[in-house]
Amino acid sequence: MSLRLSSASRRSCPRPTTGSLRLSGGGTSFGTGNSCGISGIGSGFSCAFGGSSLGGNTAGGNPCAGFTVNERGLLSGNEKVTMQNLNDRLASYLDSVHALEEANADLEQKIKGWYEKFGPGSCRGLDHDYSRYFPIIDDLKNQIIASTTSNANAVLQIDNARLTADDFRLKYENELALHQSVEADVNGLRRVLDEITLCRTDLEIQYETLSEEMTYLKKNHKEEMQVLQCAAGGNVNVEMNAAPGVDLTVLLNNMRAEYEALAEQNRRDAEAWFNEKSASLQQQISEDVGATTSARNELTEMKRTLQTLEIELQSLLATKHSLECSLTETESNYCAQLAQIQAQIGALEEQLHQVRTETEGQKLEYEQLLDIKLHLEKEIETYCLLIGGDDGACKSGGYKSKDYGSGNVGSQVKDSAKAIVVKKVLEEVDQRSKILTTRLRSLEEKSQSN
């Protein structure tokens, strides 16, 4: 945006009459008393504010009614209408400045309130008093810890009961195996006993057979003895010259002795065989029983050792499982707390970023408003200089606002002679239409007498 005052032809202006020009804070008017038209200012003076051209809008939204100074002078023509137009434009500028200052004050108040509520070192929600919930939270934490402890104790008791049941089951299985082994040994001994019983029965049968045979021989011998005794009972004497006969008694006695010796020999042989077999069998049984007993004792001891080791292993596994459960629960709790803290940190960072963004935006808006204010002040000063002439002084004490005291903006046109004046108003602007500097340069000024 630019404010240019192009130089036209150098002309002489008669000395204007003395008048006064007053500007007040709001709704002020120009007091007309100047009857001189300054013809030294050519056409081409325009007011452009906020990137608007002649007749455009200001940055605050108020219309900027541009005006053009014609060749006949600044206040030539209808002076009252021109001054009223300038008065209205200046009043609209001041109203816009007041509105912007009020908006700026409102924003500053909001920023101050926000910093008082959510300033550095504070956090959302800390202005509330949650101390009355702390005992309830502690009580709930204690209840949770007690419940966790009781659950762990119940789990340990269940594990111990399961281990005890497993121990009893192992003992039952071991005793059952031992019982089956003893039954197998008893069955084997029963088979041996049956064999011995069969051998004994055979020997008894042989003994009975020999006894019957001996009884039969004794009976025959007795009958023969009776026959011989009956035959010898008569007194028949017969002398015969014959060979001596066989003595039957001696023969029978010899036969009886032979059979008795044979029976005794058989009995002794059977008894010796029976004793020998029984002794060897008893020795074998004793050896087997000793080996079985030692093996059974060793097996029982090994089974007891195995049961003890299995019980210890189950106890260690249960302890390991409970510790793993406790570790998992602790890790899950700490992970949940860490996630909650990270969520809070993320929310606070987002809130801080939002606050910084809003602060930057408000800062930029404040700078824009301040630039607009400075531009308005410079434009008012430029108006005063243009209205008052080269020697006119625009004494401005500011206008009533938050940061500046109230005062009167006035311009006094001093008496001067005819002068040839060439003036230029130079403004430097940037790409965003922001005014950097404003200068009013008087190129040439010469005083002349009437």
Swiss-Prot record:
Q: Which residues form the IF rod domain?
A: 79-394
- Region feature (Tail): 391-450
Q: Where is this region: Linker 1?
A: 115-136
- Region Coil 1A: which residues? 79-114
Region feature (Disordered): 1-26
Query: Which SUPFAM superfamilies does this chain map to?
Result: Intermediate filament protein, coiled coil region (SSF64593)
The modified positions for Phosphoserine read: S442
> Which GO terms label this protein's molecular function in UniProt?
protein heterodimerization activity; structural molecule activity
Q: Where is this region: Coil 1B?
A: 137-228
Positions of the region Coil 2?
252-390
Region (Head) spans which residues? 1-78
Which GO terms fall under biological process for this protein?
A: cytoskeleton organization; epithelial cell differentiation; hair follicle morphogenesis; intermediate filament organization
| Region span, Linker 12 | 229-251
Protein's job: Essential for the proper assembly of type I and type II keratin protein complexes and formation of keratin intermediate filaments in the inner root sheath (irs). Plays a role in the cytoskeleton organization.
Self-association state and partner proteins as the record states: Heterodimer of a type I and a type II keratin. Heterodimer with type II keratin KRT5 leading to the formation of keratin intermediate filament (KIF) network. Interacts with KRT6A to form filaments.
Report what the protein is called.
Answer: Keratin, type I cytoskeletal 25
Which gene is this protein's source? KRT25
